[in-house]
Amino acid sequence: MIQVSRVACQEKGAYAIFQYIENIMVEKTTMFYIKAHVCNLEKALQGHQASVTYQGGIMETEALSLIDADRYPVHLPESTAYLTLIQQCRHDIKTYGACRLPGFTTPDATRRMAMETDRVVHEAYPCRDTHNVYMEKDNDAFSEDHPRRRGQTSELDVIAYDQIDPGDGLYILYQWDDLLHFIAVVLEHASYYRMADPLAALTVNVMHEGQNHGWHFDEAEVTTTLMIRKPEEGGVFEYVHNLRSDDRNEYDQVNRALNDKHPDIQALEVEPGTLLIFSGYYSMHRVTPVKGHVTRYVATLCYKDQPNVYNSLEVQKLFYGRTA
């Protein structure tokens, strides 16, 4: 059998467009029959069946090459280092509301992801929205000075999942089962799934100069992101840990944060290559306006505790300008 991949084709000085993929799961092995149009590649490749061993659809070695596996052995669940990492992440989320893994992706992999994002950034949808911190529209049932009436403006561009090439590093990382399993163990989920939404499952938030994301709570309990590119200035991730609770009224504290007077507002330093697991449902957060000509890229990897989860058509339309 001949192994065919976009990387392999590029190394041979050729360009391949993968048009059709059928995958058949056999335990942890996925057999891919790939019909490809191949340009300037040896004729021997044409018409052959390609047999590749994948875990969760992505070659283990290619996924591993993207991360600092010595520092973050997410592929070795029986190792002492893995268990130590799990304990540290759980502690950080409980204590600080965030587990930050700097240098999770290697410098080369991070640069690769930035370049691959550069390739499609012109296709990003410009999302402009005014909302309150609960991601709701204005509700005149509350007084004008109520936190639910205090509008926040968010302005960013969004690259959708279906705009990310299956050969891109970010796509490979997201499809890697070992990463999915690692995050599930950190969060103590018996079952965890990649989001089924063809637009929202994996996205890149793009922030040019002047763009920002206003104060808000996430709808998801936990969000997983990867910093791909940091701006020259601004674009700072700020949050107030555990501001929202299911059993208390947090409006006074929300108002203090909106007035920039809350004593617990923290700026989280996130360098390119950092994987962040963040409890955004309970922690109010924002991204300050970007300054300078370097565009900020942050990928969001969406996982759910139930299969076949899609965003509503309204949410799809807001963030991607279309539905799917």
Predicted regions, residues:
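Acidic, Ala/Val/Gly-enriched low-complexity intrinsically disordered segments
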Residues: 4-16, 22, 26-27, 36-38, ...
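Catalytic core of Fe(II)/2-oxoglutarate
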Residues: 236-242, 246-324
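Interdomain hinge/linker segments and adjacent boundary elements that couple functional modules
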Residues: 137-141
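Short amphipathic
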Residues: 99-104
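Fe(II)/2-oxoglutarate
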Residues: 29-94
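Short, solvent-exposed beta-strand-terminating loops
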Residues: 124-132
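Catalytic core of non-heme Fe(II) oxygenases with the double-stranded beta-helix
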Residues: 166-171, 180-271, 275
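Signature of the catalytic double-stranded beta-helix
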Residues: 105-106, 112, 116-120, 124, ...
